[in-house]
């Protein structure tokens, strides 16, 4: 059965395996999450569960959200996300989803909002080549040619240009779960994941796992 959970990034560290080799891991506080709503094909056109994560005070929520949580009879949560699943019979409104749904060796996809870098040029943003750095050249880190003149008389879509870099939804696929700590609600995955410390992460079964 497919599964997913919400979590919060704590940062990176390293652990040692049985052979004494160093494994870089990201520490994620995953769950506990609570099922706030079940969506079915009959009522909504698709099967999904809506889960909440992170406690929050009532005064920080809008009236529609307060009513949504009270109708479900669950505590107020800061984050609400949906997981589309083929089979939702194993979930009930109010039930908890904990980190022990995963085990070491599982493969997961982790989605988050990448770190924002602010306004950046094409060299930093896309890795564009520089211009000549000497011999009187006045072109070093600029965009370069943006197209012809009369024909076509415009800049084509997709042309790399300076702009806001980062702060985008990014998914890192097929990360290995190295360790699970149910007591501390910690999930250790091999490698890095998007976002700064404390940011929200969505952890799902990997779509590429065999």
From Swiss-Prot:
Any one cellular-component term (Gene Ontology): cytosolic large ribosomal subunit
UniProt keyword annotations, A-Z: Ribonucleoprotein, Ribosomal protein, RNA-binding, rRNA-binding
Listed PROSITE patterns: RIBOSOMAL_L3
Keyword tRNA-binding set for record: no
Gene Ontology BP term (one): translation
Record function comment: One of the primary rRNA binding proteins, it binds directly near the 3'-end of the 23S rRNA, where it nucleates assembly of the 50S subunit.
Protein known as: Large ribosomal subunit protein uL3
Organism in which the protein naturally occurs: Thermoanaerobacter pseudethanolicus (strain ATCC 33223 / 39E)
Lineage of origin: Bacteria, Bacillati, Bacillota, Clostridia, Thermoanaerobacterales
């Amino acid at each position: 059965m497919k599964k997913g959970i919400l979590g919060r990034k704590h940062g990176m560290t390293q652990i040692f395996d049985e052979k004494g080799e160093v494994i870089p891991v990201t520490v994620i506080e995953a769950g506990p999450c609570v099922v706030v709503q079940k969506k079915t094909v009959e009522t909504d056109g698709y099967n999904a569960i809506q889960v909440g994560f992170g406690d929050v005070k009532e005064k920080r929520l809008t009236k529609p959200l307060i009513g949504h949580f009270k109708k479900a009879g669950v505590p107020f949560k800061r984050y609400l996300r949906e997981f589309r699943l083929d089979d939702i019979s194993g979930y009930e409104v109010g039930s908890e989803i904990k980190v022990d749904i995963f085990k070491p060796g599982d493969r997961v996809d982790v989605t988050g909002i990448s770190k924002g870098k602010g306004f950046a040029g094409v060299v930093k943003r896309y890795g564009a080549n520089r211009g000549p750095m000497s011999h009187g050249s006045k072109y070093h880190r600029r965009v370069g040619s943006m197209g012809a003149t009369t024909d076509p008389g415009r800049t084509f879509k997709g042309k790399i240009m300076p702009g806001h870099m980062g702060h985008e939804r990014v998914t890192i696929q097929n990360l290995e779960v190295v360790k699970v700590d149910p007591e501390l609600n910690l999930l250790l995955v091999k490698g890095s994941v998007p976002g700064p410390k404390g940011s929200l992460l969505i952890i799902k079964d990997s779509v590429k796992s065999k």
